[in-house]
From Swiss-Prot:
GO-annotated biological processes: protoporphyrinogen IX biosynthetic process from glutamate
SUPFAM superfamilies per the UniProt record, alphabetical: Glutamyl tRNA-reductase catalytic, N-terminal domain, Glutamyl tRNA-reductase dimerization domain, NAD(P)-binding Rossmann-fold domains
Pathway: Porphyrin-containing compound metabolism; protoporphyrin-IX biosynthesis; 5-aminolevulinate from L-glutamyl-tRNA(Glu): step 1/2
HAMAP family per record: Glu_tRNA_reductase
GO terms assigned for molecular function: glutamyl-tRNA reductase activity; NADP binding
Function: Catalyzes the NADPH-dependent reduction of glutamyl-tRNA(Glu) to glutamate 1-semialdehyde (GSA).
Catalytic activity from the UniProt record: (S)-4-amino-5-oxopentanoate + tRNA(Glu) + NADP(+) = L-glutamyl-tRNA(Glu) + NADPH + H(+)
List of residues binding NADP(+): G196, A197, G198, E199, M200, I201
Protein name per its UniProtKB record: Glutamyl-tRNA reductase
Gene from which the chain derives: hemA
Sites marked Important for activity: H106
Active-site residues (renumbered): C54 (nucleophile)
UniProt binding sites for substrate: T53, C54, N55, R56, S116, E121, T122, Q123, Q127
Organism: Ralstonia nicotianae (strain ATCC BAA-1114 / GMI1000)
PANTHER family: GLUTAMYL-TRNA REDUCTASE
Length: 435
């Protein structure tokens, strides 16, 4: 069985490419179906899961396709490029393709927060669990990926429970507040707009709430969900309310700070809307953070002199400031992961002989059943039971030994020597187990 992991992330690809290969939630299940069909396979259907976040898009696959690892990865790259209507040549230089133990190690590191922009962050573990849940609902997981992800989650729990990998961590939300404080002397005097109402916006809202902004507004496509977040902020003593997303173009200029993170596949805020907002504000500065992938705010907005626009990649330098303090924890985590990778590979190696063992049992059962029926016929016609048992045992012995003796008689050269060394050990093992 081949394990494959293929993807791009913030280490290998710019935001402009990552947003092209992001998967909206509603596309994941159909995409899993076409991916599994595209992967090479023989007897069993390929298994697959897709992890898509603001910092990475990764395909986790298991296939029994008897192809070289490079060929299997080429199939996956072509599928990813075709699915998103981009040229495979544009994508390939930024893709990492990992097989077997490397794929396992990568999954363990990602879930443990070792591969994140925010070292040790916990959000990625929840995102990976969501990806597995979606793949399960789509019927895309089987024995191998199920086992991989169950062990992945166990390793992540062990790493976080026995090391300080999450200590001194600066989240993306906290980094957004720090950047805003560089622009405005006091956030308490500013009006803040949050676009979206998902987990990332909730985290950002919580961090900004600690600064007690003058006014907080939540704009969301679904007003009810925006009102729920606004109510939670009001309960923290803030002046908070919700508006519909459609109201943004006319009201954007009211806000000093804008934080956006939606699942939209197209920009929500265009250059023209921001230009009008700046004129309305009489060129007072506007701080904007776009945490969405694909982006919610057109990148051309960054060229406006009165706008300070930051993306997830721009926040990277700030969130990495505490990384040096966690290097000892990283070393501990890597040691744990390496041990668990070896454990998983032992399990995988053991699984590789399961089909052979199953076939051996099926063959032996067929021989046993055939001779048993023959013996029952002999007894039915009145043959001596002792002679029937003798005939049964002799027939079973001959048939069980036919395959090994035939192979030994017809083997030549090195193959014959290997059989001579192997067969006695197999039969000794069998006799030991009988005792």
């Amino acid at each position: 069985m081949q394990l494959l992991t293929l993807g791009i992330n913030h280490h290998t690809a710019p935001l402009s490419l990552r947003e092209k290969v992001a998967f909206p939630l509603e596309q994941l299940k159909p995409a899993l179906g076409t991916l599994r069909q595209h992967l090479p396979h023989r007897k069993s259907t390929a298994e697959a899961a897709i992890l898509s976040t603001c910092n990475r898009t990764e395909l986790y696959c298991a296939t029994d396709g008897n192809l070289p690892e490079d060929t299997a990865h080429e199939h996956a790259i072509r599928w990813l490029a075709h699915h998103h209507n981009i040229d495979a040549g544009e994508l390939a230089p930024h893709v990492y393709a990992l097989g077997q133990s490397q794929a396992v190690r990568h999954a363990f590191r990602v879930a443990s927060g070792l591969d994140s922009m925010v070292l040790g962050e916990t959000q990625i573990l929840g995102q990976m669990k969501d990806a597995v849940r979606t793949a399960t609902e789509a019927g895309a997981l089987g024995t191998y990926l199920n086992q991989l992800f169950q062990r992945t989650f166990a390793v992540a729990k062990e790493v976080r429970g026995t090391t300080e990998i999450g200590a001194h961590s600066v989240s993306m939300a906290a980094a957004a507040v720090r950047l805003a404080q560089r622009i405005f002397e006091s956030i308490a005097e500013q009006r803040v707009l949050f676009i979206g109402a998902g987990e990332m916006i909730e985290l950002c809202a919580t961090h900004f709430a600690a600064q007690k902004p003058r006014e907080t507004v939540v704009a969301n496509r679904t007003l009810e969900r925006g009102e729920k977040l606004a109510e939670a902020l009001s309960n923290q003593g803030l002046n908070a309310r919700a508006v519909r997303l459609a109201e943004l173009p006319a009201r954007l200029g009211e806000f000093d700070i804008v934080v956006s993170c939606t699942a939209s596949t197209l920009p929500i805020i265009g250059l023209g809307a921001v230009e009008r907002a700046i004129k309305q504000r009489r060129h007072r500065p506007m701080f904007m953070v776009d945490l969405a992938v694909p982006r919610d705010i057109e990148p051309e907005v960054a060229r406006l002199s009165d706008v300070f626009l930051y993306t997830v990649d721009d926040l990277g330098a700030i969130v990495r400031e505490g990384n040096a303090l966690r290097q000892a924890a990283v070393a501990q985590a890597e040691a744990i992961i390496e041990t668990r990778v070896q454990n998983f590979m032992h399990w995988l190696d053991a699984r590789s002989v399961v089909p052979i063992i199953r076939d051996l049992h099926a063959h032996a059962e067929a021989l046993r059943q055939g001779e048993l029926e023959r013996a029952q016929r002999m007894l039915a016609r009145g043959d001596d039971p002792a002679l029937v048992l003798e005939a049964l045992s002799q027939a079973l012995t001959k048939k069980f030994l036919h395959g090994p003796t035939h192979a030994l008689n017809h083997a030549q050269g090195e193959g014959r020597e290997q059989l001579i060394d192997l067969l006695p050990g197999l039969f000794r093992q069998s006799s030991h187990s009988e005792r």
